[in-house]
Amino acid sequence: MQMLNSQTILNSEEETKNFAKAFAATLKPNNIVLLNGDLGVGKTFFCREIIKYFCGENTSIISPTFNLLQTYKTPHFTIYHCDLYRLKSPEEIYELGLEEALSGNLTLIEWSEIIKHLLPTPLIEVNLKLLDDDKRLCNITNEY
């Protein structure tokens, strides 16, 4: 399934789950995925489905909103899930150990705008937009 540089309308929560898992199947270590969109649009939900794809459906997934970073081990790499909503300056990211996350691991970053210019390329960007209560527009691009 071609996902990079694509635009898809997701009509339900179930469709979003399935799409996120299909997207996860295209990911590998060293990928950096930036998730953007308004508050409550489903960035964390999308990340949860990616993490479940690699770690199993029963994995306990905690939103990183308050501590900024959560890690999840897979047999071959670690998934770093960051939520930078509360970040005040780009320099704060170094205190989290994000540099380690970027080498050989899968990194998912919500609210990435504040540090995007500091990240190595290529980057995969997932932009979510609310169309109505259940519908989302998902635009995925690969930036070099």
Curated annotation (Swiss-Prot):
Q: Where does ATP bind?
A: 13, 40-45, 133
Q: Name one Pfam family in it.
A: TsaE
Example of a GO cellular component annotation carried by this entry:
cytoplasm
> Mind listing the UniProt keywords for this protein, alphabetically?
ATP-binding, Cytoplasm, Magnesium, Metal-binding, Nucleotide-binding, tRNA processing
Instruction: Write out the function statement from the record.
Output: Required for the formation of a threonylcarbamoyl group on adenosine at position 37 (t(6)A37) in tRNAs that read codons beginning with adenine. Is involved in the transfer of the threonylcarbamoyl moiety of threonylcarbamoyl-AMP (TC-AMP) to the N6 group of A37, together with TsaD and TsaB. TsaE seems to play an indirect role in the t(6)A biosynthesis pathway, possibly in regulating the core enzymatic function of TsaD.
Q: Does Cytoplasm show up as a keyword for this record?
A: yes
Q: Which organism is it from?
A: Rickettsia bellii (strain RML369-C)
What this protein is called in its record is tRNA threonylcarbamoyladenosine biosynthesis protein TsaE
Q: Where in the cell is it found?
A: Cytoplasm
Q: Where are the disulfide bridges?
A: none
User: In terms of one coarse class, where is the protein primarily found?
Assistant: cytoplasm
Q: Which family does it belong to?
A: Belongs to the TsaE family.
A GO biological process of this protein is: tRNA threonylcarbamoyladenosine modification
Task: Identify the residues that bind Mg(2+).
Answer: 44, 110
Superkingdom classification of source: Bacteria
- GO MF annotation list: ATP binding; metal ion binding
Keyword Nucleotide-binding listed? The answer is: yes
What InterPro entries does this protein map onto? P-loop_NTPase, T6A_TsaE
